[in-house]
Design a protein with these regions (language model features):
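Membrane-interface "cap" regions at the ends of multi-pass membrane proteins
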Residues: 28-96, 110, 114, 139, ...
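TM-loop-TM module centered on a large, flexible mid-protein loop between adjacent transmembrane helices
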Residues: 131-139, 143, 174-179, 245, ...
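Membrane-interface loop-to-helix entry segments
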Residues: 170, 184-239, 268, 291-295, ...
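Helix-loop-helix junctions that connect adjacent transmembrane segments
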Residues: 55-60, 99, 180-188, 213-342
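Hydrophobic transmembrane alpha-helices that form the core helical bundles
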Residues: 88, 101, 110-193, 198-201, ...
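Alpha-helical transmembrane segments
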Residues: 373-381, 426-444
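A generic transmembrane alpha-helix motif of multi-pass inner-membrane proteins
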Residues: 225-228, 416-418, 445-499
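Select transmembrane alpha-helical segments in multipass membrane proteins
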Residues: 62-73, 107, 139-156, 189-192, ...
Length: 499
């Protein structure tokens, strides 16, 4: 739609548009009296945007409520991540001062979560970042480039994130399968990925029930670990700081950045419901509430869980452990209880990758519907009404990506995602507020623009301390995507803008 501002002799701004979108809005609101032929009061512009979003989500079923949304986010956030990364976080800073990385990560996640919340409430469609970048920069030169770059980096980072869950799953399976080889671990990854695709190959209402069931197992696992740690907590063990633990230096700054990178990998997922916004009931209220509740709940759980573990298992021993959760329970209750704990960790890991694939499979679908990706991904299952082609494609790519090492997967996925997704979204929110008055914002960021500034500084700090190899990877994937986009624009025939 191409709106142009015109003068209203009765007072107030109106917009002129002779396109079909406003005629459709008038059909929905026949009681509206237009000031002149072709003129529409500005309070109806949001209806036009909503009409475009409705066409994008046409055919999808809004089967997710608040409980399912929180379950989806928290299942994604609390996966295998903390159970396999606690030793890495401790090693990054060399002691219990690593808790600073977790706490700063929680602040960053909450600040960034407010960015997601306002964007998702204003644009409650399917696709998450793709949708926000497309709508925020629709009338600028970046309106085509940024959505394309997001899909481009997602081809790398999305399957990598899911694959990290597969790797963590097989790592804990080796607690039972002692002597597991690398080839056997890959077979486990393939089996888990195949089962996941089979479970997601169904309608969203059934998936919502599965998500809640998995979430219950996640909460039980975390509560057991936290309660056990509190009951056996030893402050002298938890706060056994090494000499010069808080001496600021270049090494301390780099270590803190590394700890925050790993912490944000563990926190990632607070926004997962945004990718399925077209399948959420009352998204303007449900999505912001679910994001904020998920971040606060998981931040509290992670803080208690980390203190619980390092308050029982000395940190010098913990950072060498391959099964920190199992070792923690075994120290307290013996090997049989540790076996149960390991099984629960596997349940938690599976719930996480289930939530990830559910959310990420909607991104290519939304891009295809908007004309920014291959049309085959816009297909819905004839009976289940879910994007089955996208589920299969992302699921298979994640299985392939799971053949790589865990540390490379974590660093590469964050380095490739920070610039085009997290930082670009902060500017997208500012763009919406300043240049898109036609879009209603039912939820507004608290203390704007302070949370956005905190999120921007935090993501830049993590990116710049991730290491030169991963900085180069993030920059090259972005530059490469821009070059591919330029070539694609030269080769393809122009596609009319949606709406």
């Amino acid at each position: 739609m191409d709106f142009s501002l015109c003068r209203n002799p009765r007072g107030g701004a109106v917009r002129r548009n002779s396109g079909p979108s406003i005629r459709r809005v008038h059909a929905r609101f026949p009681q509206t009296t237009y000031l002149r032929s072709g003129e529409v009061p500005s309070d109806l512009l949001y209806a036009a945007v909503s009409s475009r979003l409705s066409r994008q989500t046409e055919g999808l079923i809004r089967g997710f409520g608040f409980t399912e949304a929180v379950a989806l986010n928290m299942s994604n956030m609390v996966g295998a991540g903390p159970f396999i990364t606690i030793p890495l976080v401790i090693a990054s800073m060399g002691g219990p001062q690593c808790m600073l990385g977790w706490l700063l990560g929680a602040v960053l996640a909450l600040a960034d979560g407010l960015v997601w919340a306002e964007l998702a409430a204003a644009l409650p469609g399917t696709g998450g970042t793709y949708l926000y970048l497309r709508e925020a920069f629709r009338k600028t030169r970046l309106g085509g480039l940024l959505p394309f770059l997001f899909i481009w980096q997602f081809i790398f980072s999305g399957p990598l994130e899911i694959a990290s869950g597969y790797i963590g799953f097989s790592q804990y399976v080796s607690y039972f399968w002692r002597g597991m080889t690398a080839g056997e671990a890959r077979l486990v990854n393939v089996a888990v990925g195949t089962l996941l695709i089979a479970l997601l190959y169904r309608g969203i209402t059934a998936i919502g029930r599965i998500t809640v069931a998995l979430w219950v197992g996640v909460l039980f696992t975390m509560l057991w670990i936290v309660a056990s740690g509190i009951a056996h907590f030893h402050a002298s063990v938890a706060f056994d700081f090494p000499a010069h633990a808080f001496t600021f230096s270049a090494g301390f700054a780099a270590g803190l950045g590394s700890a925050m990178l790993i912490a944000m990998y563990d926190y990632m997922g607070y926004y997962d419901i945004c990718y399925t916004g077209g399948e959420v009931r009352d998204p303007a209220r449900t999505i912001p509430r679910s994001i904020i509740c998920s971040v606060l709940a998981v931040a509290a759980i992670y803080t208690l869980m980390n203190l619980s573990i390092i308050g029982v298992v000395p940190w010098r021993q913990a950072m060498q452990s391959k099964f920190i959760a199992s070792q923690f329970i075994e120290t307290l209750y013996g090997p049989k209880a540790a076996a149960v704990a390991t099984a629960l960790v596997l349940w938690t890991a599976f719930a996480s990758v289930f939530a990830l694939l559910l959310g990420y499979s909607r991104i290519p679908y939304a891009a295809a519907v908007g004309g920014h990706f291959f049309p085959v991904f816009a297909r819905l299952h004839p009976t289940g009404k879910f994007p089955h082609v996208s589920v299969l494609a992302i699921g298979l790519l994640a299985i392939v990506a799971s053949f790589w090492s865990l540390d490379a997967v974590i660093s590469a996925l964050l380095a490739s995602r920070i610039l085009v997704q997290f930082i670009a979204q902060i500017f997208a929110l500012d763009q919406l507020r300043r240049r898109r008055p036609d879009i209603n914002r039912p939820f507004r960021m608290w203390l704007y623009p302070v949370p956005g500034a905190i999120a921007f500084c935090g993501w830049c700090y993590i990116f710049l301390t991730s290491g030169w190899a991963y900085i180069a990877f993030g920059l090259l994937t972005t530059i490469g995507g821009a070059l591919v986009y330029a070539l694609w624009q030269r080769l393809r025939r122009p596609v009319p803008a949606a709406g």
